[in-house]
Amino acid sequence: YVNLYGGIDMDTMQGLKRTHYCGDVEGIGNEVVVGGYVQKVRDLGNLIFIDLRDRTGIVQLAFDDSTDREIFEKASDCHSEYVLMAKGVVRERESKNTAIKTGNIEIDVKDLRVLAKAQTPPFEIVDDTNVNEELRLKYRYLDLRRKVLQDNLIMRSKIAKVARDYYYEKGFIEIETPMMIKSTPEGARDYLVPSRVHHGKFYALPQ
């Protein structure tokens, strides 16, 4: 354990390396290591199920009577948006979930690491969250964890790559210089940097 961030005990990733993203887990009997955010915890007493989420999807972590007691208790203390690393064996899921890609399998957890704890978020991190835009913008870093917004960012990245690849193939060179970037009204804050060439003048560098 390490003791950081106000005395909260958290685990390290030492000895674990991710083998699969949550949405890509497959192969019954395979040993896998996954990491991500806690989407939901279902504590049924002698059974605990945790939906673990990353940008590719969700996979269910399972804890039962065969689980090491320390790991079981650690799972029972988990809450929404905790960051976990889990190692275990893929097995068939008794209660199938056709709504997700990994709905036919689950991970029988043998090792669980709590990498970061979290307070209860101001709104639920789901695509159909019912919250006003002002609150979403205030907690933009949480809002961007929702898949619908991540899909937009991924699409934007792909479009930008296609455009760049096209111009690179045509012999264009991409440059970024503050003298060719115009400040925008109501845009990001500008930083004023003195010019070493034109004394008494400044560059306005958009944040």
Map each language-model feature to its residues.
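Class II aminoacyl-tRNA synthetase catalytic cores and aaRS-like
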Residues: 1-207
